Design a protein with these regions (language model features):
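N-terminal start-of-chain detector that recognizes signal peptides
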Residues: 1-2, 21-24, 71-74, 85-87, ...
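Glycine- and acidic-residue-enriched helix-capping/strand-helix junction motifs
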Residues: 1-9
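Flexible, glycine/proline-enriched loop segments at strand-loop-helix junctions
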Residues: 3-4, 78-80, 132-139
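N-terminal active-site beta-alpha-beta segment that forms phosphate/nucleotide-binding
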Residues: 9-90, 95-99
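Conserved phosphate- and dinucleotide-binding cores of soluble alpha/beta proteins
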Residues: 94-212
Length: 212
């Protein structure tokens, strides 16, 4: 049975991809997570080093599992046993071949909207890895950056805070309080409107609800 939401998203994606290309980024459309996995396989040569930021979409699409089972070097910070080891892995991320992440929101103009706590994710988006692949579900499309920032604080952060047990208003009240708590997830806001190194950032639009 046809899904009108997916049909509408497919149409909207054409506009977004055109705007991404104008901004020096590559844009792709996939109907399903399975299609996205096949696309990633075609974009990422075997033997590449793989890093990723905090992203549920990377796991939900099955892309992470696929890469772990393939011939890739996975730079997994979760395997670090000390703060020193974790920092070393974070630094390796900057020199990785491919960095995977999602976006908190993506505007119709092709602008990536991200708010980060630890901020390794937005740091690698901005500089370092040879390629950045951004996996974006259709639930993250917004009209403009203002709507994108609102989406982060009202839709994305509360469940993410609950997942991470931050102890911030996002978790305890269910809405962003623009706090200065130790577990604050809203430390750095990055809006990516242009990519100077053409093709470095590749955005894959997936016609599914993914991530937060």
């Amino acid at each position: 049975m046809a899904d009108p939401r997916k049909d509408a998203f497919a149409t909207t994606s054409k506009t977004i991809i055109k705007n991404l290309e104008r901004a020096g980024m590559e844009g792709y459309f996939c109907e399903t997570s399975a299609d996205a996995r096949e696309l990633v396989k075609s974009l990422v040569p075997e033997g590449s080093s793989i890093a990723w930021g905090g992203t549920e979409t990377f796991k939900e699409t099955g892309v992470k599992e696929m890469l772990e089972a393939g011939g890739y070097t996975m730079l997994d910070r979760a395997k670090a046993t000390t703060p020193e080891e974790q920092r070393a892995v974070y630094l390796q991320h900057f020199d990785s071949d491919f960095f995977f992440m999602s976006a908190n929101a993506l505007t119709l103009k092709g602008e990536l909207v991200n708010i980060d706590g630890n901020s390794n994710r937005v740091a690698c988006l901005s500089f370092g890895p040879k390629h950045v692949i951004v996996l974006v579900g259709m639930n993250k499309i917004v009209k403009d950056t203002e709507e994108g920032l609102k989406r982060v604080r009202t839709i994305a952060c509360p469940p993410n805070a609950a997942r991470l047990h931050t102890g911030t208003p996002c978790e305890t009240v269910g809405i962003c309080g623009m706090c200065h708590e130790p577990g604050c997830m809203c430390c750095n806001t990055v809006i990516t409107r242009h990519n100077r190194h053409a093709g470095r950032i590749k955005v894959i639009l997936i016609a599914e609800d993914l991530g937060f």
